[in-house]
């Protein structure tokens, strides 16, 4: 039996904004386009949700519901950076990671030895680590299959988790509304209700041939989900565009020799290991370094390089240290590579 964790960040874009500007924490905010441009809301914080503001809502409607709503245009570089760090935390527990977007992912921890193999404890640790290292909260669902883990992650939001053990699956499905199954939208739910199908138990009692006749392939998927069947594996190639590793230091460092030691003894070996799991012996697009200073400002430096190269990374880090540190202590050191687009990589490899 598999152990699947679905991690979903809590109002992610808005949470990053509130973290970086605490004055926004208790006021209604939303990330989205302006009313003039007929934009839509990407996400809203919980104070805004109390007024009925929701994701995918037209901005004009959101402002009618909450006239004092603060609209923010979005800082996608900041969201991407936080997402990369979250993925790095996931990778401490398993290499079987399937990102669904910047703020959610599936993890298969079936064979992980962390926390004595307990997926529940791993989910707790992952959420706590995200809170400690990024000052953001996440919710999680734990189940033996993907779709149930995704449903479970929404049952104890925000900043909570819900476990569906294999023994609990039949009871959980008995009263589960079909509208909760990922992929069942409002239109499909209405069609199913017209047939008297509202819960998974209703589908369990129905004829598969009838479902196939009326809904085709979707009918089979619906029947399988209602039985608790979901054989999809983790697709860990999905959206994977970079590999990185970084360390937040217990004490600020001021000497380049300390930084070089961290890179050569800790970061580079770990980066090699992670890259080997994703793209062994294949080309990369760029590699680079990141330094964060004790005033919380940070800088990155990268350039085109076809293969992972320790000497080049050390030289890049030293140049960045000398030119941008300005006497400040360094509290975080990171290395990363940007992966080559698969189609371009294939063209280059075939041309060699």
Swiss-Prot record:
InterPro entries: DNA/RNA_pol_sf, DNA_pol_Y-fam_lit_finger_sf, DNA_pol_Y-fam_little_finger, DNA_polymerase-Y, DNApol_IV, IMS_HHH_1, Rev_trsase/Diguanyl_cyclase, UmuC. It catalyses: DNA(n) + a 2'-deoxyribonucleoside 5'-triphosphate = DNA(n+1) + diphosphate. Pfam families: IMS, IMS_C, IMS_HHH_1. One of its GO terms (molecular function) is magnesium ion binding. Residues 4-185 form the UmuC domain. It is found in: Cytoplasm. Keywords: Cytoplasm, DNA damage, DNA repair, DNA replication, DNA-binding, DNA-directed DNA polymerase, Magnesium, Metal-binding, Mutator protein, Nucleotidyltransferase, Transferase. Its cofactor is Mg(2+). The record marks 13 as: Substrate discrimination. Mg(2+) binds at residues 8, 103. Binds 2 magnesium ions per subunit. It is an enzyme of class 2 (transferase). One of its GO terms (cellular component) is cytosol. The active site is at 104. One of its GO terms (biological process) is error-prone translesion synthesis. Its EC number is 2.7.7.7. Poorly processive, error-prone DNA polymerase involved in untargeted mutagenesis. Copies undamaged DNA at stalled replication forks, which arise in vivo from mismatched or misaligned primer ends. These misaligned primers can be extended by PolIV. Exhibits no 3'-5' exonuclease (proofreading) activity. May be involved in translesional synthesis, in conjunction with the beta clamp from PolIII. NCBIfam families: PRK02406.1 (NF002677). Belongs to the DNA polymerase type-Y family. HAMAP family: DNApol_IV (MF_01113). Monomer. This is DNA polymerase IV. The gene is dinB.
